Amino acid sequence: MMKKSMLLLFFLGMVSFSLADDKREDEGEEKRADEGEEKRAAEEKRFIKELLPHLSGIIDSVANAIKG
């Protein structure tokens, strides 16, 4: 009876450890995804800030190209 109890406790401990490890991995993936979204948003803001001063020139160039 003692061996069965020990095996059951060992099995439950391994399952618990596995579930906790999976949870940590999932949280890590979510954190990396959030960081990736933040980096992407920051890059878009930086791109727009650099593009704005040149926007009127780009529009004029396109308009001149259309006029021929």
Swiss-Prot record:
Family designation: Belongs to the frog skin active peptide (FSAP) family. Brevinin subfamily.
Taxon lineage: Eukaryota, Metazoa, Chordata, Craniata, Vertebrata
Main subcellular localisation: secreted
UniProt-recorded name of the protein: Kasstasin
Region entry Disordered, spans: 22-41
Organism name: Phlyctimantis maculatus (Red-legged running frog)
Job of this protein: Peptide with potent vasoconstrictor properties (EC50=25 pM). Has moderate antimicrobial activity against Gram-positive bacterium S.aureus (MIC=55 uM) and against Gram-negative bacterium E.coli (MIC=110 uM). Not active against fungus C.albicans. Has weak hemolytic activity against horse erythrocytes.
Any one Gene Ontology cellular component term annotated for this protein: extracellular region
Keywords linked to the UniProt accession: Amidation, Amphibian defense peptide, Antibiotic, Antimicrobial, Cleavage on pair of basic residues, Cytolysis, Hemolysis, Secreted, Signal, Vasoactive, Vasoconstrictor
Tissue distribution: Expressed by the skin dorsal glands.
